[in-house]
């Protein structure tokens, strides 16, 4: 987590904003694992079909949440709260990809990672 993030971190009484701050922290920590400086892998490379792949990931997380809600006991690994935080972060990835601003995204491809059609 960078110093700039710490300086601009919002302080307020709304728990929902606190959750968003936790999601930011989680996203930054996970990105250090998945897109570390020693790797050639960029974030956009995880989503071969662009936003469609991100939608698949969100759907997978929603199914996991449903499964956890229907279970009788506590989960062994990822909690329901963790799952919802992941959904929030995947939604931010979708918006980033739609804007064409995800790290490693090709500017000549659309939000589905298909070559852009040139207009005549």
Model-predicted regions and their roles:
Residues 1-120:
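Intrinsically disordered, low-complexity regulatory regions
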């Amino acid at each position: 987590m960078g110093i700039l993030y710490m300086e601009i971190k919002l302080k307020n009484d709304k728990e929902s904003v606190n959750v968003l701050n936790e999601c930011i922290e989680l996203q930054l920590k996970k990105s250090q694992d998945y897109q570390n400086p020693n790797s050639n892998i960029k974030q956009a490379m995880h989503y071969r079909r662009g936003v469609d792949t991100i939608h698949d990931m969100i759907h997978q997380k929603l199914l996991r949440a449903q499964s956890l809600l229907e279970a009788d006991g506590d989960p062994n690994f990822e909690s329901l709260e963790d799952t919802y935080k992941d959904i929030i972060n995947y939604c931010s990835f979708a918006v980033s990809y739609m804007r064409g601003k995800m790290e490693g995204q090709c500017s000549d491809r659309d939000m589905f990672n298909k070559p852009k059609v040139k207009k005549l």
